[in-house]
Amino acid sequence: MTDVPVSRIRNFSIIAHIDHGKSTLADRLLQVTDTVQQREMKEQFLDNMDLERERGITIKLQAARMNYKAKDGQDYVLNLIDTPGHVDFSYEVSRSLAACEGALLVVDASQGVEAQTLANVYLALDNNLEIIPVLNKIDLPSAEPDRVAAEIEEVVGLDCSDIIQASAKAGIGVDDILEAIVQQVPPPADTVDQPLRALIFDSYYDAYRGVVVYFRVMDGQVKKGDKVRLMASDKEYVIDELGVLSPTQVQVEALHAGEVGYFAAAIKAVADARVGDTITMANSPAAEPLPGYTEANPMVFCGLFPIDADQYPDLKDALEKLKLNDAALSYEPETSSAMGFGFRCGFLGLLHMEIVQERLEREYNLDLITTAPSVIYRVTTTDEEVIEVDNPSLLPPIQKRLKVEEPFIKVEMITPETYVGTLMELCQSRRGVFKDMKFFTQTRTALIYELPLAEVVTDFFDQLKSRTKGYASMEYQLIGYRENPLVKLDILVNGDGVDALAMIVHRDKAYYVGRAMVSKLKELIPRHQFKVPIQAAIGAKVIASEHIPALRKDVLAKCYGGDISRKKKLLQKQAKGKKRMKAIGTVDVPQEAFMAVLKLDPQ
């Protein structure tokens, strides 16, 4: 057993928007409490994936146990459970918040409250956490602590009269933060005598030990060698290794209610130890699991194909390995006439999709083509059957469809007032429905829109950032399905449909998208020896077309003067050859053409 009583344990997390200094603050807390020796310290200690360091975001959750001697002379154990700040991972955030009793709300003193911060604060309030506001980066010349403190009071409704002013980089105010955690965050409930219940808030795959599970003991106690059951996946394991994270793993014999630790038990895949699952004893299980477990469902889908067909087995292996570590990733084999063999993959959101692609290319040295992202459509067929379609090429023909429904999301954008107009215009052009507008302070405004998810998955976020010079932030949640007049837009190159370019669009926008698409392809597909028509069609009706003229040799060059019939003969011979070539020739569609779909601007 670790010797600290439950009353002297504090479990807390840090809530902050991307770039507001959360990881740096975590570094300082580790340093001040001597958890990490000075020589081992490096920037962003808890972000241990290269990609996290590079993008400056936290993807996987980290946890760290710190021993702190408070001003009252007592020794406390502080467990920091770090959370990802990005909207795609909000389920993981909610689980890690459920493992805490308190949270530090870190806000950049020069920027103020952002949308994702707000979303996570609401999650924290739902979990009844004690929230301690902290102003970070107060040493910046552009810091406006009074304005931002007023904004936090206004927007979040927290009392900021004694807000902690800190600078994680300069190390200002770190002791105040530690004291505030001890004084204000309530200790965990003392339920050591009850049957074991523990919450899994993260897990990762280790090549030697199998899955390593990070968990927080809610009730009871757990010892090394215990046989435990995971309630959602209903599997039983014997704990081989039990320990605490200070941030490196340190083995212990037992953990009791209120403590945070890890265990390894030869679990084969992360999917068997899902985030949010409840751990209990196999022989004396708890009556009911901890609340709040849900399966993470993918929302965005796209096809991944290797540029070189020989890399297909490598892509398969890479996806299998990533899946061990990322339970939210789903994939199934797919074949395409244009691209060959590949996989249809499902992701939590756009950032998740980009990260998976980048990890595949970086860690497994693969060259990939990705098709345009799509969402799950619900189609009711004429036989009253409801099917879910995540790939445009699988949409049933128009005669067999009664209605098509698409997922809608509620988007909350927080922006400086000057950019409200351009953002409203952006949402309007994406079939958005205006719902509400709130003025937080003189300069900051929240816009709430309902939008089809399909309109957001392509480049909405990039547009939002570029139209507001990077100042706006957004947060979204799924609100359900709605019926819309959606059609499948096919792209035909030389008379053949290219399934990787097919897309599902709103009927009113189909012409503009088709028009933009064919003119873009005309620029990107190289000229061939024969004329290549490019068409956009809905069913059998062509709505837009372009032609790429043939490359042709001047066959009359050697006829100086001479008879017209001689020239006609040569031209007809050439035309005949071109005709034959067109019948048997294939058109080479380059990789850029598939990428162009993502960056279309159908105006």
Curated annotation (Swiss-Prot):
Residues bound to GTP: 19-24, 136-139
Coiled-coil region(s): none
One Pfam family this sequence matches: GTP_EFTU
Molecular functions (GO terms): GTP binding; GTPase activity; ribosome binding
Catalysis: reaction(s): GTP + H2O = GDP + phosphate + H(+)
EC numbers: 3.6.5.n1
Keyword field: Cell inner membrane, Cell membrane, GTP-binding, Hydrolase, Membrane, Nucleotide-binding, Protein biosynthesis
Membrane protein topology class: Peripheral membrane protein
InterPro entries for the chain: EF-4, EFG_III/V, EFG_V-like, EFTu-like_2, G_TR_CS, GUFP, LepA_C_sf, LepA_CTD
Swiss-Prot/TrEMBL GO biological process terms: positive regulation of translation; translation
Xref: PROSITE patterns: G_TR_1, G_TR_2
SUPFAM superfamilies registered for this protein in UniProt: EF-G C-terminal domain-like, P-loop containing nucleoside triphosphate hydrolases
Function: Required for accurate and efficient protein synthesis under certain stress conditions. May act as a fidelity factor of the translation reaction, by catalyzing a one-codon backward translocation of tRNAs on improperly translocated ribosomes. Back-translocation proceeds from a post-translocation (POST) complex to a pre-translocation (PRE) complex, thus giving elongation factor G a second chance to translocate the tRNAs correctly. Binds to ribosomes in a GTP-dependent manner.
HAMAP family referenced in this protein's UniProt entry, alphabetically: GUFP, LepA
The protein's name in its UniProt record: Elongation factor 4
Species this chain originates from: Synechocystis sp. (strain ATCC 27184 / PCC 6803 / Kazusa)
